Curated annotation (Swiss-Prot):
Taxonomic lineage from the root: Bacteria, Pseudomonadati, Pseudomonadota, Gammaproteobacteria, Legionellales
Organism of origin: Legionella pneumophila subsp. pneumophila (strain Philadelphia 1 / ATCC 33152 / DSM 7513)
Encoding gene (name): prfA
A single GO cellular-component term on record: cytoplasm
Protein purpose: Peptide chain release factor 1 directs the termination of translation in response to the peptide chain termination codons UAG and UAA.
The name this protein goes by in its record: Peptide chain release factor 1
UniProt PTM: Methylated by PrmC. Methylation increases the termination efficiency of RF1.
Compartments where located: Cytoplasm
Primary residence: cytoplasm
UniProt xrefs under Gene3D superfamilies: 3.30.160.20, 3.30.70.1660, 6.10.140.1950
């Protein structure tokens, strides 16, 4: 472990012990605001501090065992030799846990997300691939126990979607899917291709963390134009009898959102407003990320949807993620929702990137 990281851990442990002492003082207990604030800090410091204490204890054990190896007592030396590998492995595991604890936490990691998949270049084939991508994300979401809620969909003429937007809710959704924003390129032989030639088309994916109602973005009602229209698509006899679908335009930015999934106009309006707030906040965050990217390139990227991040080559059964030069020959598994094959290496690389930054700045 780097000296700079060990120094940071030592400071955190000292602060943890100090806060523990403060919480037992009568003056702190009497002040509810201060007590609440310190209790929160103590809870945040506790996991990493306890882990660091275990790490220090294991290192002390290793030092003691190394001394016993030099002992004249052969039984003690043999016992030390048997235990030393176990303790070394324990230190390695604790070291890994500590590094994970030190990684700065993304405040959005626990949030639900809005997923947008749009067909790009490639016409009908791009729309079909957009449908395949949405199915892949849906399968992955189901495997994680997440809920998927359709917001709006524009169907392709020969299957798939020109655009589809859905909300995915569950535990730490953004932390898993935040690496998916960007351009996804597909190389395959379309079903309509009689010559067997490989075509290249593309889709763009956007992952936006849901706006927290507590930290709501303020929208002036005068800045909105709200239109109602009749839903299209599945819905049986109810379809086209009422103008239940909603389109909201944010006039200053030109951002347009639609929702046609619910039969109730009120519900569609609420969903559309939630999506609009998320889009506006996402635009602001993307702008900030682009400014930050001038000094440091991040694996999550700038949020630029035109940035090509991945290629899906069906004839070769190959997926390539261009950001970390990752190539996997398990494309069919991934398209069936086994997205962890891609997400896990991306997360490891991202965490390594954050740790390297941490070491440089401390």
């Amino acid at each position: 472990m780097k000296k700079s990281l060990e120094l940071k851990l030592q400071q955190m442990l000292e602060r943890y012990e100090e806060v523990g002492r403060l919480l037992s003082e009568a003056s702190i207990i009497a002040d509810q605001n201060q007590f609440k604030s310190l209790s929160k800090e103590y809870a945040q410091l506790e996991p990493v501090s306890q882990c660091y204490e275990s790490y220090l204890e294991a290192k002390n054990n290793l030092d003691s065992l190394n001394e016993l190896l030099e002992s004249d007592d052969k039984d003690l030396a043999t016992m030390a030799e048997e235990e030393i590998d176990t303790v070394k492995k324990q230190i390695e595991e604790l070291d890994e846990q500590l590094q994970w604890h030190l990684i700065p936490k993304d405040p959005d990691d626990e949030r639900n997300i809005y997923l947008e998949v749009r067909a790009g270049t490639g016409g009908d084939e791009a729309a079909i691939f957009a449908g395949d991508l949405f199915r892949m994300y849906s399968r992955y979401a189901e495997s994680q126990g997440w809920q998927i809620e359709l917001i709006s969909a524009s169907h392709g003429e020969h299957g798939g979607y020109k655009e589809i937007i859905a909300k995915i809710s569950g535990q730490a959704v953004y932390s898993q899917l935040k690496f998916e924003s960007g351009a996804h390129r597909v190389q395959r032989v379309p079903e309509t291709e009689s010559q067997g030639r490989v075509h290249t088309s593309a889709c763009t994916v956007a992952i936006m963390p849901e706006v927290d109602e507590i930290n709501d973005i303020q929208i002036n009602p005068d800045d909105l134009r709200i239109d109602t229209y009749r839903s299209s698509g599945a819905g049986g006899q109810h379809v086209n009898k009422t103008d239940s679908a909603i389109r909201i335009t944010h006039i200053p930015t030109g951002v347009v959102v639609e929702c046609q999934d619910e039969r109730s106009q009120h519900k569609n309006r609420a969903k559309a407003m939630s999506l609009l707030k998320t889009r506006l906040l996402d635009a602001e965050v993307s702008k900030q990320k682009q400014e930050q990217a001038q000094t440091r390139k991040s694996l999550v990227g700038t949020g630029d949807r035109s940035e090509r991040i991945r290629t899906y080559n069906f004839p070769q059964g190959r997926l390539t993620d261009h950001r970390i030069n990752l190539t996997i020959y398990q494309l069919s598994d991934i398209m069936e929702g086994n997205l962890s094959l891609v997400i896990d290496p991306l997360k490891r690389e991202y965490h390594a990137e954050l740790l390297a930054d941490l070491g440089r700045h401390d």
